[in-house]
């Protein structure tokens, strides 16, 4: 039996690791919580509160053995930016969002949960590394991400949680990936290379949309097989680059992901220090239930 520290109930379910794209959900929180939510020094607090509420809700739902939150390093380019000048071009973040992204890892750490952030890597890469480690050790993982690139991580041991509407998450396994994209999870980078990704400014192959990309992959089996047969010879170098950019880097460095006991009380103290008192009260109440 496993004690759920949030709900104070026991569960027979074998816990998975929970891996979260921190930037993805911090952005959603920033745009979903009123800007009137302030913290100490009249700084923005909405993204912190919204992300914290999301984290608590997801923790109660999944009852994980461990949590890892991956973060982008926005002040340092990754190899993707160096390889493709247009990658993620035109993105701009409000100063208040940047400020909260800077301190959210501190909040997650106060909760007793793991964070991963390093120059040259994106949050996606830490998700891939954590999933690879968990599967290698025979465990299971749940990956929460608003980025469909994460579908490439789906397997019989890893489920993707994708936000679909307010407060709701779709559970994506290999069957759902095939239904949505018409390809297996391992071919999602090939699919993105052919179709392109407007949000990341990956151009793709001119004139090829989602159906065309899926059709080409069904015909050839993979992008590499298509290139080996001489297809798209003039674009081969670029397509391989697009595939590499769309592929999550499972070699990203990770902190230890041993079983965790959340420290909601410490997180409550930090929230109170930041004068986010409603959040502090909620965390303190959860901490009180987990001690029973």
Features from the language model and the residues they span:
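Noncatalytic, basic helical substrate-engagement surface that gates or grips nucleic-acid strands
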Residues: 5, 11-144, 148, 152-159, ...
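Non-catalytic nucleic-acid-binding/docking modules located in mid-to-C-terminal regions
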Residues: 4, 14-15, 65-68, 136, ...
